[in-house]
């Protein structure tokens, strides 16, 4: 390989914890151009395949035309690179920041070396498009006269709204929160995705004709029947926002929060007053225990540290993953390897050790005499294969209990599905996983003219999957309205 992989440089952990801004210094344009040259333009580009292997995606679910725009970056044709990128992805400004880069995990270069830095090429393309004016608003020339309501302004709802508006339908997006963006706005901290990036795109969508209504909770503030009367079609894109709880003794202790509420309050206070209103969960000088080893748990680690937590511990039920691919996890499968994310890096820098405790779960929340949380009892787990089902099952290890000091606990244990009142308001059926039920591979619900998309449809997932769902749902809605669809979704 003529050129070595180069990526953006992260600010030193001890410096970046002093602020809540993005903290990567990206490559200059010429160096980024050379990174495009590393792409081999494979005859079978696994990077854009988006196929499921062993229940996990390999390659980009959006089927981004990765080899094409990598080559266009290398040849310096930035505008055409942007055009090819936007053909399959409505929001590269989001995915180039928060996607785990499924494309890179499936890159052929990664077989015997370092994969192409596709995610950073994507970032360079979209940011160059904004600086050069390529990303300006392009309102549809013709309107169909059809009206569509999209309920929820997360990545899936926004993707559906964007495509349906491009088709010429009049789209109104309803958001129950005070700001547009859903998960992007309040579920992802500012240091991963600065909120002005979301606002920048929303303002373009407004110029293109999309209407946004915030602070309106459909099913409560406005009846579902009114929307069904006022609009030709309704798209439910409300996410999977029902958090999984930890029902251990002492759960009623003061100081236990769901991670999603913790992160939302933090971002809202940051945007409203730069934390001067004090309307966030204060972790300064406190021992914080985070239950959950995923991305949300990591975001809680980074956020707690920025507020001056005395200590941060992250509890993970699963065993620690290997540092390199195991023999039974070959390319191009998603690599099940140990990842140390930005929050954990910061914890190591501040406290001198990795915050994670593996193969453990909470046994009890311990309260003081006033009902305040003062400690957490955890227990070690062992994992064994059930001979009857072949599935792994966990067992507590007797005598392995441990007490952790904790004034704050943040539960980041995933989500159980959508808020039931929304489904009830429209009368749509739910499946056994409490997601809205559709015919497999389709987006029409059990109620006429009501469609569903995103996490509300497939369950908790990645932003890139949400965008794909939104695009496919838009195609289904358009076909329902017009009898055919000329929307290109992949």
Language-model features and meaning:
Residues 2-9, 13-25, 34-37, 61-75, ...:
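Beta1-alpha1 glycine-rich phosphate/pyrophosphate-binding loop at the start
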Residues 24-54, 78-102:
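Immediate flanking context of iron-sulfur cluster ligation sites
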Residues 297-300, 307, 453-487:
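A conserved FAD-binding loop/helix module that cradles the flavin
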Residues 152-155, 292-294, 455:
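Glycine-rich Rossmann-fold phosphate-binding loop(s) that bind the pyrophosphate
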Residues 124-142, 200-220, 243-307, 430-442, ...:
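Glycine-rich dinucleotide-binding loop and its adjacent helix/turn
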Residues 254-285, 384-460:
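FAD-site-proximal beta/loop scaffold in flavoenzymes
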């Amino acid at each position: 390989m003529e050129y070595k992989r180069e990526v953006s440089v992260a600010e030193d952990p001890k410096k970046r914890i002093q602020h809540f801004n993005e903290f990567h210094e990206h490559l200059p344009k010429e160096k980024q151009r050379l990174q495009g040259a590393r792409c081999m333009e494979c005859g079978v580009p696994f990077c854009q395949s988006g196929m499921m292997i062993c229940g996990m995606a390999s390659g980009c679910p959006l089927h981004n035309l990765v080899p094409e725009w990598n080559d266009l970056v290398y040849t310096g044709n930035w505008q055409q690179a942007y055009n090819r990128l936007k053909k399959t992805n409505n929001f590269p400004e989001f995915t180039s920041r928060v996607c785990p880069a499924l494309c890179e995990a499936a890159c052929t270069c990664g077989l015997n070396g370092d994969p192409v830095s596709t995610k950073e090429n994507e970032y360079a393309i979209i940011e160059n498009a904004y600086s050069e004016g390529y990303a300006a608003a392009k309102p549809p020339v013709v309107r169909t006269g059809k009206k569509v309501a999209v309920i929820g302004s997360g990545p899936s709802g926004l993707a559906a709204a964007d495509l349906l508006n491009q088709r010429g339908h009049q789209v109104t997006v309803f958001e129950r929160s005070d700001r547009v963006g859903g998960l992007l706005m309040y579920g992802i901290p500012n240091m991963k995705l600065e909120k002005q990036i979301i606002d920048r795109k929303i303002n373009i969508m407004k110029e293109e004709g999309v209407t946004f209504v915030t602070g309106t909770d459909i099913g409560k503030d406005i009846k579902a029947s009114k929307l069904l009367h006022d609009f030709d079609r309704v798209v439910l894109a409300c996410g999977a926002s029902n958090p999984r709880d930890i029902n251990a003794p002492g759960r009623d202790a003061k100081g236990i929060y769901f991670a999603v509420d913790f992160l939302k309050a933090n971002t809202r206070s940051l945007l409203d007053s730069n934390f001067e209103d004090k309307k966030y969960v204060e972790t300064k000088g406190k021992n914080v225990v985070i239950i959950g080893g995923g991305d949300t748990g990591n975001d809680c680690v980074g956020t707690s540290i920025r507020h001056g937590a005395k200590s941060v511990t992250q509890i993970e039920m699963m065993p620690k993953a290997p540092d390199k691919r195991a023999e039974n996890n070959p390319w191009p499968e998603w690599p099940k390897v140990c990842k140390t994310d930005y929050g954990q890096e910061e914890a190591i820098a501040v406290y001198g050790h990795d915050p994670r405790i593996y193969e453990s779960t909470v046994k009890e929340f311990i309260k003081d005499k006033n009902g305040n949380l003062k400690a957490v009892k955890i227990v070690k787990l062992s994992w064994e294969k059930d001979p009857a089902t072949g599935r792994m099952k966990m067992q507590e290890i007797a005598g392995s209990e441990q007490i952790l000091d904790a004034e704050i606990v943040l539960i980041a244990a995933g989500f159980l599905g959508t808020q039931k009142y929304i489904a009830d308001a429209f009368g749509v059926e739910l499946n056994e996983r409490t997601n809205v039920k559709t015919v497999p591979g389709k987006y029409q619900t059990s109620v006429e003219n009501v469609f569903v998309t995103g996490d509300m449809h497939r369950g908790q997932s990645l932003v890139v999957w949400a965008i794909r769902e939104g695009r496919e749902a838009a195609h289904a809605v358009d076909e329902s309205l017009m009898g055919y669809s000329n929307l290109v979704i992949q």
